[in-house]
Each structure stands twice: as C-alpha cells, then as structure tokens.
Amino acid sequence: MRSFFLLFFLIFSYGSAGAENLKPSRGIIATSNPYASEAAYEIIKKGGNAIDASIAVQLVLTLTEPQATGIGGGAFMLYWDTDKAKLFSIDGREKAPSKAGEDLFLNKDGTKIKFYPDAVVGAKSVGVPGIIKLLEEAHKKFGKLEWAELFDYAIELSKNGFLISPALHNTLGYLNYLKTVEPAASLYYEENLKGEKIPLPVGYILKNEEYAKTLKRISLLGAKEFYEGKTAELIIQSLRDADKNSLMSLDDLKNYQIVWREPLCGLYRSYNVCSMPPPSSGGLTMLMMLKILEDFDIQKLDPESREMVHLFSEVSRLAYADRAYYMADPDFINIPSEELLNDKYIDKRRMLIDLNKAAKTVKNGNPFENIDFGKNVDISKPSTSHFVIIDEEGNAVSMTSTVEGPFGSHLMAGGFILNNELTDFSLMPEIDGKKVANRVEGNKRPMSSMTPTIIFKNGEVYALTGSPGGTSIINYVTKSVIGLLDW
C-alpha cells in the first residue's frame, strides 16, 4: 500500500508541476502515456476543459496503447460538473450485435470453445464500439473547444510517428497469434534475419497513416462518420474478411447509443465514494467491499500485515461471489443493487468472515427471494487504460476505456484495433440448469469490471482513481480507496 501513496504523489506532482506553464491551480492530468498527457495539456492551455482534454487523450491512447484501449472499444466516464455541482456517468460500453445468441461461444456439443485463440481472435468476439459516441455526446453537452480541434494532436502524431514504449513492445512479444493476423502483423512486427516476426523495438518511431485518415474523417463529420460512414464500412469489411458469417451489421453500428446512467455512490468513513453502476460490476462490488470493511478498525492494521491481507482477501471473495451471480446489463436483468448494499445483508456477509482462517469455499448470498441465476463463466485478461483530468474550473473526469484483452480481437479497421469485448459475457449461458445473468444476448452489454471512481468530501471532489487489470480492477481500486481514506 506504500507503493500506492508513492504513485498518488507522482501522479499529482506531474499534473501540477510536470508541465512548464501549468500551475497547481490550473488542473491535473494523469494518464498512462506521456503523449496522451501532452495532448491533454495542449488542450487545457488553449482554454479547453476536462471533457475536451479527455477526448484528446483517448484519441492518442488509441494510437500509442493499442494493446489496451482504443476507439474500436468501449468506456465508462464519470464527469463532475462544478457549475452544476452534479456528477454524471456515461455508459459507452460495447453491445453485442443484434443477431448474437447465447450459443455464441459454444461448440456443437454444448461445451464452451477454447478461450484463446478460438473465442478471442477474429470476428466472433467483436462488440459494437462505444467510445466515439461517448466522446461526442459528452462534448455536445459539456465541451468548450471545437470538436475538430481536439483531433489535431493525434492526427499529427499518427502522421509523424511515436516512440514504441516498453509496455507495447512487451505485449507484442507474447501474443503469438497477433503475428499471423493482418494488418496488425505488418504494422507492429518486423522480420529478423531468420525470417521470423519479432516485435518492433522500444524507441522505434511508428507511423499510422490509416488511423490519421480515420481521425480526419471523424473530426470533420463527427460520430456519424464512424457509425454510418466509411469507417463503419471498414469495420464491417474487416469482420467479413475474418469470418464471412460475422454477425455484426451496418445497422448494429448505426443503432448504437450510449446510456446516461445514475452514478452509484456510497458513504465510507464519511466520504462519498462514487463509481459506475451496472453493466459495470466495479462500482457495486467495490461498495459492497467497503461496507463490509467499514465495521473493521483497519486503520490500526499495517497495510502489509498478514491480518490485513487476510481480511481484504476474504471480503473480496464474498463480494466477487455475488458479482458472479447477480451482475449484468440492467437493461436486460433485474439487478438487486439496493439489496446487495442493504445493511442487514452486508452484516450477514460480514459474519461469514473468520479473522483466523480462510473459508474453504465462498458461496453467493441470497439478497432477495425469487432470484436464481447460474454462475458467470468468463475469462478476462488484464488490459485497459485509465486516466483522470481536472481542469482549472474544477470540472473532473475519471474515465476507463478498453478493447478488452491485449490487442482485443487482433483485427483492425481504419488503423485501430477492434475489441474482443463479447468474451466478457459468460461463455456458458446456463449452469446447472440455471440461466446466467451475464449470458450473451443480442444488443446486450457485457458485464465489466471497469471502476472509474471519484471521491467527494463535504460535497467537493477529494480524489479520483481507477485502474486497468481485467477482473482485478475492482480489487485494485478498492485498495486505492482504503489506502487513501484509512491510511
């Protein structure tokens, strides 16, 4: 947990003093990539706000962190509007194509197909992307600068090239199937003297002209171009080339809509901790963990002690057990959010914890009657990107975006990676005769673990946090919250 405080200090030091002319009072920028941070800084310098800067960041991350995120994927955004004193949550999660059915990841005998590469690589795993729609809708409602201006940095960087990072290079090194999928193989690998494909080296200047063209079209024509124009056609063509029976259609792209959802908030140690509601499982699972932990005097425990590690592990197991059964797309499933956070239910779950030994098995609870789902069966590989921005007016963004696994489906269109988000659904639609809440259904959003979070104290923004990491995201963010508020 001490490493968390070091990270917290570095992030906020960079945001307040890392840019030459950016005074502490003018804003905070914390991203996973220096190019993205610079793009955001340039927007803030021009008078843009947190939303404007977020758009610039995401467009650059698509280029520089294709292994983790991109406009071919989805995102959740929390936005604090300081003038309105209101928190907004925007759901830009991908959706399953309308023709997708619960047997999407099943063999003919009803068993689940092999996860990698069968389920991941190719058209089968690709959901309808949501990021561009999210960014445009946020900009229409809150942005200050012109839409096209927010694309300039990413377009120029795509044309002139960026330095391959160690993170990108290392990911390329272990994805054997990516070497066989074009155009990604030709873009991110080179041949050695033996004719073997090897990752481009750290520091190599990589240009992406196709992505520059895509950004230029969207900058001029807006999200409509992505969902109905040439970019939409390129997406469908890429899927058809990979699988002639690909399920996604132009209508699926055209009909995609984001959802403005009510933020999910709860008190912890007198602070108001807010995150995303379902289809993210992050906010609900984190708040369950915090409510269970609040009854323990963990401030007296060493963060790295055996007692604290044991307690956190047991709390996490209890919350994740409920997550596996009850969380999914709320537009399809009645999720017992209030019941899962009910004090009496939390007390029952807390009483299952033995401070001296780990439970042999942890079962889901029963938050209310007449709810009976099978256990979610999915495999999530660590990926994703998170960033936070506060502008000089105090507006704040906490946003997590992803293409799901490393390099998503491995397919590309218009210079960007297409997600493999549908593997976030349960691979098995039914367990022991019970339907799984997070099963595949047409137009449904898969459950996510992304947990963008904003913490408030006395009605004002106190801290912003979030993380990459697949299903471990929830644990990471919960640890950062208790690290900040308890220690």
Question: Residues of each region from the PLM?
Answer:
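M16/insulysin-pitrilysin zinc metalloprotease superfamily fold
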Residues: 283-299, 455-463, 470-487
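Sec-dependent N-terminal signal peptides
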Residues: 4-13
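Active-site rim segments in enzyme catalytic domains, especially the processed small/beta chain
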Residues: 63-67, 74-89, 246-249, 395-463, ...
